[in-house]
Amino acid sequence: MPGGVNAVYMGLCYNCGGNIDEDRLEKGLPCARCLPSPPRRATPLTVYRALKKAGTLGAYSWEYLSIREVERFEAYFAAKSGSRLWSAQRSWAKRLVKGDSFAIIAPTGVGKSTLLTVYAAYVAAVKRGRVLYLVPTENLVRQVYAKLDQVEPGIATAYYSRMPAKARESSLEKIASGGARLIVATTGFLSRRFDLLHPQYKFDLAIVDDVDSLLRNSRNVERILLLTGFSEETVEAAHSLVKARLKLYRALHSGASESIVSRLEQEIAQLEARLRLSLSEASPGQLVIASATGRPRGVKHLLFKELLGFEVGGGSDYLRNIVDAYVVDSDPVGRTAEIVSALGDGVIVFVSQRLGKDVARAIAGRLEGMGVSTALALTGARRPVEAFARGEARVLIGMASRYGVIVRGLDLPERSKYAVFLGAPSAKTHLLEALYSPRRMLAFLSIAQEKGVEWAGEAFRRLSRLLEKVIDTSIVSLAARGKLEAQGPAGEAAGIISETAPRLVDWLVAEARLQGGLLRVGGLVVDARGPIPYLVVPDAPTYIQASGRVSRLYRGVMTRGLSIVVDEAPEYVEALGERLKWTTSSRLRPLSEVDMEKLRREIEESRRGKGRRVRVKTTLLVVESPTKARTIAWFWGRPGKRRIGRSVIYEASVSDPETGDVHILQITSTRGHLTDLTTDSVGSKYGVDEDGGGYRAYYSTIKRCLDCGAQHTSSSPFCPRCGSPRQVDSKSVVEILRKLASEVDEIVIATDPDREGEKIAWDVFLAVRPYNPNVRRGRFHEVTPRAVIEALRSGESVEKSLIEAQKVRRIVDRWIGFHLSTHLKLKFSKPWLGAGRVQTPVLGWIVDRYREWQDTRGYLVIFKLSSGGRTSYFTQNRLEVENLKRVEWLEVVDIAGKTEERNPPPPYTTDEYLYDASRKLGLSAGLAMKIAQDLFESGLITYHRTDSTRVSPTGVKLALEYLASRGLEGEAQPRGWGEGGAHEAIRPVRPIDAQDLERAVLSGSIRIPIRLTRLHIRVYDMIFRRFIASQMKPATLDIVEATLQAGETVFNHAGVARVRGGYALVNPPRVEEWLARLSPGDRIDVEDVLVVKSSLKRLYRAGDIVKMMREHGIGRPSTYAKAIEQNRRHGYVIESKKMRYLIPTKTGVSIYDYLSNGFKKLVSVDTTRRLEEALERVEKGVEKPEAVLASVWRMVDEAVSLHAATGDVMGQSEA
């Protein structure tokens, strides 16, 4: 390409596996060697034909053949069903025709059953394969068989126990003889008649509709695997491996000896080898599971993961168009009867499990007595549901059980309009048993501690410290119950729980009875109204799943519905609302606020197909971090999960409330950058070549060593650091992304909204573009459901100017870094040494300050006062120190005071955050950024790499909501703190402080994908207080400056004596109350005098360096911490343990002196700043990349030439 920087991606041509230019990938074309004369418009068909004509068709032939197979199936589907594949169906069809085994996770109404029915007939009739179709009930056997008979008459053989005797015998004979091509039966048939199927049948396709019915008998998992072609030896090997991994997991987290752990690791390695060998000889059929919801128990379901690469579980139906309301009444049964009677036809009543089946019978009787026809569905019988479906019963009544027949198995959109919950859905456990959960124990101990219970505070502190060292708290829970023996911290924690639980039960019961018998703690309720105290946990997933029966996709519209919770206790309703607040956008409101006339009209019209049409899209959402992927996946219920190689792909569904679009998401991560400049001997300038006025930069996929963790971009099969051949290559991620891209309608790349994130996004775009042209860039600055939905909605593209600037930045860093590092390694004969464009000026600041510190060393005399305060005085005079050590009091010579109104500081930018994290919490820059990254990716704070103080309207609203909840609305003063723009300051994304966050996590109201440590809480607290304070009125400060005399020495001490109102109520400055009590002539007794070595010039901390980097313009939010950490990694700088001061090592001083003398032009602050400014101009499009690179190469060349001319010859060692 003329001018600019053209990236060449080594080994990423999708047809031949050779090198390919980025402009080719951007157009969806293979490399120039494969296709010298490309077609005008690149489509799979035109590219395939051109490659075939050129005689260079390679790996792309498989993709084309897959496309053709999908087209053949689509034609069959259209002919047999009378309609074309919907978006979601097409996505699944692509996976089906490739032979993938997987679980379908999707909302009701998108065509799963229709697709699978037609596909089953297609495999049996067209592919001549054998098919097994399993469903949970006999009623469904009849329905599926009838549909199959319409698609391919006579192709299916159905069996269920209530068939006419002659038909039943005929089916059994056909199955037993081996003559059945497509068998439809219940999962019960699999258990009872397995001997008819195995070993004579090896199914090419097995479909399981509703995995829970399969898993009720864990042996069925093995049976279905055997029927799809796995040998008994393979299944047994997989089962043994699963059990061995669980044993190792428990051993590691229960303090088992090293010999036990080592033995288990060896056993696992042997089992893995055995399983790999078995799988290499296997040719299994295809297993597809639909409606894979729920939480499988036991370990057998993990065989699907080991053998087929997917996991069952997940998929709560969070797509709803429902008004959520509640009523509190002392007679909930009577009030429920009134409400149901008034609603009329199409009501489903869900009775809470804590109330029991007798209450379900009671409400049915009450309604029948009022003349309302009901159907009571307390078992799996089909008749009540059929009566409701036919309109013979106006009301259907059942239990609010996650796996209940009317919660999971009901799909009657035209009939189901209203959901009424008699009692908030919940489950109850004996309180003592519940407290064996470490998290719940901590949640309740924190409440007791807050109320001044000393023993609870001590137990909380001890247990918290121990649990910090325990990865899996379930080990502690089992040990506390006496079901497992645990050692170390886990065992100690279990002991504390066992001792504390009975005492805590007594305290909670007493507290609950003071409040009428019910005590709500966040999303939990202690019920002490009876002789046995219980912990009641609201079941938000069941509420969402059950209420979803009255709202689903139907006739292209999401039907409208109404859900009403009726309970006698407001605590239960509030606890359910608390749980819903964190997991969904649902908010319970009083029924009296609902406009029933309008809502009834909307409910009826939506069932006639009126209303906003819903478009269903399949979307691949790509992020860079596995943590961020997990956070997003859990926003809309328990996600499905599949594994391809080392990648995890989560599956979930989400509805956009503004557009009505439904996205069936596949969410995965790149695990960081995919490519970087190669270190191979390619190009004349360290992986870069001049190219007709521009440059060609050679990028290679990134390899990571599995033994030492080192990363490299060479083509060597061995790690350059330790020589190990065990490494993973990001090329495998590229291949997985390409596979996923070919399965979906669109790809949204939602990597971080900064330069690094843009480069990752560009690499992903180029990787998938040949497989799917519908690629968009999604950006969000907070990981929240709202932000993700907005990103899915946006139609942005990758910013080319940012990419161009990032390429230039990387090349500049490579040129300067490689030149300097090469000199250092040869000069000092130490191969690990290195230097960099920003790293070296930072080292210079640290070295210079250290020298200043040494030159001004002295003594800090600290006086500990009887008034409770402290003051200090610095001197370099040793005799003065000795005199001051004998001082018994300080005399107040003079007092000066003033009162000032002080505005709050703005919310944090990255540099200010790092400064305070270092100063207040003693964190290194690297650890501070790691903690902030965790909080961001877990959906707790906004993006942490920012130089903006701007607060969005959403942020302002959040602060006002929090202040109102604390009765501080009168202290609010909203501020935007900056002009409009994409970036925001660092702030929380929820109106909850650190204490409430910790309780919500401990009680299970909030689920986050990381272990929330005390350090996470402290950092969150610091960010939260700073942000809330920024939205408050100024505080009034009384400032006192006292002139004090100690013996012959006179010195001053100034500080804040009092603070009143405003932001100080949330984020107070340091207050020294003893100053307010001083008057001239007072004597203050000195309790103790401490003398420590000090200096007039304090050593820098990480926060000081970050501030200087911003002030001098030599860094960006994404590089602040990295520059310091690189100096530490090379051994140039250490950090003092207590005060976190940065101290240069002897090597660091030598390196800096050598570079600053020999390569001053390359490592000076001025040069680094000018380069940063030039890169900013490239980013803005006002300077050409090639001009900057040419200038930098000349500068490097001149510096090297000048260095050589001064007499220092490369290769001459200091030795």
Swiss-Prot record:
> Region (Topoisomerase I) spans which residues?
614-1215
Query: Where, in this chain's numbering, is Zn(2+) 2 bound?
Result: 705, 708, 719, 722
Zinc finger (RG C-terminal-type) locations? 702-729
Q: Which CDD domains match?
A: DDXDc_reverse_gyrase, SF2_C_reverse_gyrase, TOP1Ac, TOPRIM_TopoIA_RevGyr
- Cofactor comment in the record? Binds 2 zinc ions per subunit.
Q: What cofactor does this one take?
A: Zn(2+); Mg(2+)
One family from Pfam that matches here is Topoisom_bac
Where is ATP bound in this sequence? 89, 106-113
Q: Which UniProt keywords apply?
A: ATP-binding, Cytoplasm, DNA-binding, Isomerase, Magnesium, Metal-binding, Nucleotide-binding, Repeat, Topoisomerase, Zinc, Zinc-finger
Concerning SMART domains, the annotation shows: AAA (SM00382), DEXDc (SM00487), TOP1Ac (SM00437), TOP1Bc (SM00436), TOPRIM (SM00493)
Q: Which GO terms describe its molecular function?
A: ATP binding; ATP hydrolysis activity; DNA binding; DNA topoisomerase type II (double strand cut, ATP-hydrolyzing) activity; reverse gyrase activity; zinc ion binding
Q: Which residues bind Mg(2+)?
A: 624, 752
Record field: catalytic activity: ATP + H2O = ADP + phosphate + H(+)
Q: Has the keyword Zinc been applied to this entry?
A: yes
Q: HAMAP family per the record?
A: Reverse_gyrase
Instruction: Say which family it is in.
Output: In the N-terminal section; belongs to the DEAD box helicase family. DDVD subfamily. In the C-terminal section; belongs to the type IA topoisomerase family.
Protein name, per record:
Reverse gyrase 2
